[in-house]
Amino acid sequence: MEPWKQCAQWLIHSKVLPPNHRVTWDSAQVFDLAQTLRDGVLLCQLLNNLRPHSINLKEINLRPQMSQFLCLKNIRTFLAACCDTFGMRKSELFEAFDLFDVRDFGKVIETLSRLSRTPIALATGIRPFPTEESINDEDIYKGLPDLIDETRVEDEEDLYDCVYGEDEGGEVYEDLMKAEEAQQPKSQENDIRSCCLAEIRQTEEKYTETLESIEKYFMAPLKRFLTAAEFDSVFINIPDLVKVHRSLMQEIHDSIVNKDDQNLYQVFINYKERLVIYGQYCSGVESAISNLDYISKTKEDVKLKLEECSKRANNGKFTLRDLLVVPMQRVLKYHLLLQELVKHTHDPMEKANLKLALDAMKDLAQYVNEVKRDNETLREIKQFQLSIENLNQPVLLFGRPQGDGEIRITTLDKHTKQERHIFLFDLAVIVCKRKGDNYEMKEIIDLQQYKIANNPTTDKENKKWSYGFYLIHTQGQNGLEFYCKTKDLKKKWLEQFEMALSNIRPDYADSNFHDFKMHTFTRVTSCRVCQMLLRGTFYQGYLCFKCGAKAHKECLGRVDNCGRVNSVEQGPFKPPEKRTNGLRRASRQVDPGLPKMQVIRNYTGTPAPGLHEGPPLHIQAGDTVELLRGDAHSVFWQGRNLASGEVGFFPSDAVKPSPCVPKPVDYSCQPWYAGPMERLQAETELINRVNSTYLVRHRTKESGEYAISIKYNNEAKHIKILTRDGFFHIAENRKFKSLMELVEYYKHHSLKEGFRTLDTTLQFPYKEPEQPAGQRGNRTGNSLLSPKVLGIAIARYDFCARDMRELSLLKGDMVKIYTKMSANGWWRGEVNGRVGWFPSTYVEEDE
């Protein structure tokens, strides 16, 4: 048996790889093992399996997504621990790039073989390898670097289950919440629904007791042993949690015991706003535990006091460290408890009301999960900051990381290619030169000033580092050209740049006269449109710098008319002052959600508005006015004439509400949508692609019209999509309610229904990477068989991806679920051929 196969068996026995992993298949190749180990995550877990706590998993990047920087950091962490903990010599180790670039995978196998023979590894009782004579054929490793370059990496999510394990603190939580079944009266009414209600009430009582016990048995006694800063860093906002839960517990008890749970749904809806303080707690709990560990190690008196407190609180069963994780567990249980109650509630009105409460608690859970997720991202950002020399600006200001890796760059007026490592964020690109394990910052590119464009002519060269695309300055300054190692990497970089630019300038950012920009909200904030919380700790959503409206990316197209013009040029939004009128009630500011108004009679300024109001707005019958201010008692309203752009006051009886306009649909996240594009540009995009590659573009000459461009018989063909009476069609005999529906239909039915000479379906969206012909249906079939479908869910809300790992959803989408990661509230699934992560609270599983 070849050494790499024996290595794979050793990894399985070490419980790092599952027994049915693809490296055990008859079709397995050494490439499969190399690709599995490349990110360093499983190697770090291997050391922890051989000796627990060899590596602190919080210090590695558990989902590096093939970021070169993060993968190399993981690999170097593994190599350092091999020396420091396992006593291996540096000469016995491979170098980080031997694995990441698989330039010497034979050396990697050799290192793992030596590791298997260290005293620590042998003490586990697992046989080292090789266990038999084998021929070490170096030739099998030679083609790996090219194969890695040519193969698009997908996540093997099931592999990481062993790394994540159970939710931290889960067992402690379950132990604390155990119902005392012996005390439960047994009666016929004690049905499943009654059990659900009893569980909600009892667990809330027990949880409140746990919080009170932390306050009474730990906080009070430790106050004189800790400094004020230490005290606050360990206990965060637990006193606030105690107050909220004492009150919540009483209201839940009152509703279930005294009111037959008729108002239970309202209790949870009312408390959602008060429970967002968990964002602060969950942001700080990891640091709290680290600080507690450090204080315990450095202060003997505190260590002894903690042991004493634990004995008084619960006979020493749970330490303070155990108990600090419980609040994070509890806040993520409310929606699960309500979900079970909804399932066993049959009265239609009660069920509908409880679903409102369930939505509120799902929103809260997603908010908390995103805070946790952002904390992981902030750790990554901190690592970037510490590893880049000459970087004086906080990387945090550049948004979330989209990717990093090696690239070659030229300015458009020079032709010398420079080897660089770039870090791409939402708002900027940090261009660096590699210096050993660190990087030297050479330039920061502000992406707000740039757009990207493909350079398809470079694809014809068909050699490494020849695949280029442009970064063009929007104000005409000198641009850049980036060159990628392979065509597939170029496609990946283009997607990542497009995602970053779509975060900076999303569709509908300026719709209805708004001026939306990415923004970090320092307070917990809800979306103007869907009323759900803006998620995370930084750059959570978008702020209109004119009227102060706040929204999710996916909701921008549905924010109603902008309430003010030029009210926020700089700095934070300030709400407009209310005007008062001595002759009538003080007018209130109209919610910007009021509809546009249609003018039904001319007004040229007579009679004039009151002196306290402002200039008249000249309008003519048929004009459309955007309402800015007014109320039912006002004779004059303020508005903007959409024809002239002028703002002023007009008689309220001169207008009537305009017909409702359907919400615009955002197709930007679809792999086939190209946005506004001319025919020639579409032909350029398709010229070097395989037949049946297609895109859907917005026709720039005819507003609101779309066209399909598809490569057929080596030529680009264009099909106009007709819209009439709210339907889309390319053939008169078949009409569709949406563009999405039309595209989905022609993925499975030939276009010859409308065009006899076009006998093809829509097969390859132009944004998706094209696989080399030799590998199409071969390598992917070997490495990435269709994952097991765990279930089907329906999207309840729109969701717009923020990076390439995420999966955009439109309300009503049918989602195949592949992975459920309860640890962070995100699931992995597929919609219309696209695979990625999405918030589990945005979908509802089919029962």
UniProtKB/Swiss-Prot annotation:
Out of the domains of life, which is the source? Answer: Eukaryota
Q: Which residues form the DH domain?
A: 192-371
Query: Where would I find the PH domain in this sequence?
Result: 400-502
Q: Does the keyword Ribosomal protein apply?
A: no
Q: Where is the Calponin-homology (CH) domain?
A: 1-119
Q: How is it modified after translation?
A: Phosphorylated. Phosphorylation can be mediated by ROS1. In osteoclasts, undergoes tyrosine phosphorylation in response to CSF1.
Q: SH3 domain location, by residue?
A: 592-660, 788-847
According to the UniProt entry, its GO molecular function terms are: epidermal growth factor receptor binding; guanyl-nucleotide exchange factor activity; zinc ion binding
What is the name attached to this protein's record?
Answer: Guanine nucleotide exchange factor VAV3
